[in-house]
């Protein structure tokens, strides 16, 4: 795990396995099936770091030999909220790690001015729940900011929100940080820049199209 001094709320998961798999995702010749599998695997690996600081309490259990007070996650279970549509490919990896998590959805599409347009919000009960928002790309940052806005407007505290993405552009991270400096953003790579079409460079193309085998 490393950080960039420009972005205090950004955490880059630089584990060799994650970087290896991300390289294969970037390859334009990687098949839809392999892209989907790699996205799931990387998200699972990132999930280990994202959940490192979950609150812990103890529970009395009987082992075959003795009774013991053993650690369990405190409070309500996690909620995983993919930003549609590409975020769906990340939710499976997180559910592999935490299969009892609740799942919500936030649907947005990017308008011609690159601003997000919301078309769907479905969330589990919010009280005392820890939320992980997921979307493979933080390009302009507007969709990520909007997703966090959705939760904060419903009085979810910033400390209970984490955003996870595969790749991000510095421009988008800056937008996210300006809007939500109190929310942690985890990525596998901070890429170079956005091009004139607001695509991340080098990036991995359109994550949704590559995930579902569609064309923009």
From Swiss-Prot:
Catalyzes the conversion of uracil and 5-phospho-alpha-D-ribose 1-diphosphate (PRPP) to UMP and diphosphate. 5-phospho-alpha-D-ribose 1-diphosphate binds at residues 85, 110, 135-143, 206. Allosterically activated by GTP. Its EC number is 2.4.2.9. GO terms for molecular function: GTP binding; magnesium ion binding; uracil phosphoribosyltransferase activity. It is an enzyme of class 2 (transferase). The keyword Nucleotide-binding applies. Binds 1 Mg(2+) ion per subunit. The magnesium is bound as Mg-PRPP. Belongs to the UPRTase family. Its cofactor is Mg(2+). Pathway: Pyrimidine metabolism; UMP biosynthesis via salvage pathway; UMP from uracil: step 1/1. Keywords: Allosteric enzyme, Glycosyltransferase, GTP-binding, Magnesium, Nucleotide-binding, Transferase. Pfam families: UPRTase. CDD domains: PRTases_typeI. It comes from Burkholderia ambifaria (strain ATCC BAA-244 / DSM 16087 / CCUG 44356 / LMG 19182 / AMMD) (Burkholderia cepacia (strain AMMD)). PANTHER family: ADENINE PHOSPHORIBOSYLTRANSFERASE (PTHR32315), URACIL PHOSPHORIBOSYLTRANSFERASE, CHLOROPLASTIC (PTHR32315:SF4). This is Uracil phosphoribosyltransferase. The keyword Transferase applies.
């Amino acid at each position: 795990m490393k950080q960039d001094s420009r972005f205090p709320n950004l955490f880059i998961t630089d584990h060799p396995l994650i970087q290896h798999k991300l390289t294969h995702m970037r390859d334009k010749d990687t098949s839809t099936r392999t892209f989907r599998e790699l996205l799931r695997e990387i998200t699972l690996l990132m999930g280990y770091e994202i959940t490192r600081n979950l609150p812990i309490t103890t529970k009395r259990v009987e082992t075959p030999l003795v009774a013991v007070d053993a650690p369990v996650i405190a409070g309500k279970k996690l909620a995983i909220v993919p930003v549609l549509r590409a975020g769906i490919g990340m939710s499976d990896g997180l559910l592999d790690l935490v299969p009892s998590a609740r799942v919500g959805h936030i649907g947005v599409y990017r308008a011609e001015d690159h601003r997000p347009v919301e078309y769907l919000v479905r969330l589990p009960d919010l009280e005392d729940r820890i939320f992980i928002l997921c979307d493979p790309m933080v390009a302009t940052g507007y969709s990520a900011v909007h997703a966090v806005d959705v939760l904060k407007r419903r009085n979810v505290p910033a400390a209970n929100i984490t955003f996870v993405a595969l790749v991000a552009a510095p421009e988008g991270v800056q937008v996210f940080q300006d809007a939500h400096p109190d929310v942690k953003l985890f990525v596998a790579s901070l890429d170079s820049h956005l091009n004139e079409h607001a695509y991340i460079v080098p990036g991995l193309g359109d994550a949704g199209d590559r995930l579902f085998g569609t064309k923009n």
